[in-house]
Amino acid sequence: MEMAESIPCNSVVGGNFKEVSPEKVIRFKPPLYKQRYQFVRDLVDRHEPKKVADLGCGDAKLLKLLKIYPCIQLLVGVDINEEKLHSNGHRLSPYLGEFVKPRDLDLTVTLYHGSVVERDSRLLGFDLITCIELIEHLDSDDLARFPDVVFGYLSPAMVVISTPNAEFNPLFPTVTLRDADHKFEWSRMEFQTWALHVANCYNYRVEFTGVGTPPAGSEHVGYCTQIGVFTKNGGKLSKPSVSQQCDQHVYKPVYTTSYPSLQQEKVLKFVLVGELLIQVDRLRLRYQRMLRDREKDRGPKPGDMDSCPAPHLLLGAVFTEAEKARIESSPKPFCEGEKFYIPLQRLLTYPKLHRLCADEDRVRSLIADSVCLSSDGSAVVVDLHNSWDYRPEEN
């Protein structure tokens, strides 16, 4: 992260620019909100949570950034502004590319309208709850209730709370609250005193850090945004503890969407068949090339595909030595008349197909109604030639 820059602030009076020398504008690179979001993303990278909730999610920008993480399977946003949730839910919808190249694991994203100081059992058992620039918007009554709801009732494995550092404010042109809706802004001592008390009451430990490094010469004020990272002692709640909680559904669902994933059989089948047909066609074209080479009396015999020079580099495929060895040791494709047979065992040695599904029986059941199989089901069968083939020798 770069330090903040101090830039002279100009005002406009009667259409003329006037320099206001005592005042400085602080500009962060990257912008401060992006630094806060990046802090959360770094935590997700390190801890790989499966269930994440953002309290006070606002326009859902953080959720949009988090939905790309393969470890997350449930992503929830809660906000008091229902209109904002309605207008930003579309940000979280799957893109077309996420259907073409789906996730490995399921992901459900839900936005709830409600107050962060209300108890809703659908947020129990989460790995990470984020409260980014939230607590300063709570009045004194809600702030008093906040710890018991988030740390006592929801009791996630980790909580991240960020809030403005009031000690940084004198560096800004206007030494007032940074937002008209802020009910308070704490110094580092005030925030840390509150956070340590909360951690002690609810069996958490807390570490303090921040984002928004001050300009040179002002290091004594600390970060512009102060952050507390709370980690529950002993890890997550045990499953019995979560299950003992009574169902309380006080939040109103505003938006929900589910992402396609390879855990869904229809999606797996679609991707598997597509990748299999690509590999089959590569092998078919390669076999044709060897036939042409043989006809010109300068290449290998049709049955000896692997003696072809650099066979693994055909059509851009790149394999490790171990992958090459696994492919070469598998049953080879063969031709009977105008029919080309590619054993399933062979196909499943190719990395992309192997990653999708390594179980031959399951692959057979998934593709049976989409491709032609041999009578014993051991091989995919296609025509050796088709009308789309490019045959340069005929031109």
Curated annotation (Swiss-Prot):
Disulfide bonds: none
Keywords annotated in UniProt: Cytoplasm, Magnesium, Metal-binding, Methyltransferase, RNA-binding, RNA-mediated gene silencing, S-adenosyl-L-methionine, Transferase
Required cofactor names: Mg(2+)
Main location: cytoplasm
Domain of life of the native organism: Eukaryota
Recorded family membership: Belongs to the methyltransferase superfamily. HEN1 family.
Organism: Mus musculus (Mouse)
Catalyzed reactions per annotation: small RNA 3'-end nucleotide + S-adenosyl-L-methionine = small RNA 3'-end 2'-O-methylnucleotide + S-adenosyl-L-homocysteine + H(+)
InterPro entries xrefs: Hen1 (IPR026610), SAM-dependent_MTases_sf (IPR029063)
EC number(s) from the headed UniProt entry: 2.1.1.386
Biological process according to GO: piRNA processing; RNA methylation
This protein's record includes keyword Oxidoreductase: no
Protein name: Small RNA 2'-O-methyltransferase
Residues binding S-adenosyl-L-methionine, per UniProt: 79, 115
Compartments, record wording: Cytoplasm
Functional summary from the UniProt entry: Methyltransferase that adds a 2'-O-methyl group at the 3'-end of piRNAs, a class of 24 to 30 nucleotide RNAs that are generated by a Dicer-independent mechanism and are primarily derived from transposons and other repeated sequence elements. This probably protects the 3'-end of piRNAs from uridylation activity and subsequent degradation. Stabilization of piRNAs is essential for gametogenesis.
Gene Ontology MF terms in the entry: metal ion binding; O-methyltransferase activity; RNA binding; RNA methyltransferase activity; small RNA 2'-O-methyltransferase activity
Tissue expression per record: Specifically expressed in testis.
Organism lineage string: Eukaryota, Metazoa, Chordata, Craniata, Vertebrata
Residues binding Mg(2+): 133, 136-137, 182
RNA-binding in keyword set: yes
Note describing how the cofactor binds: Binds 1 Mg(2+) ion per subunit.
Gene Ontology cellular component terms for the protein in this record: cytosol; P granule
Pfam families from the UniProt entry: Methyltransf_23
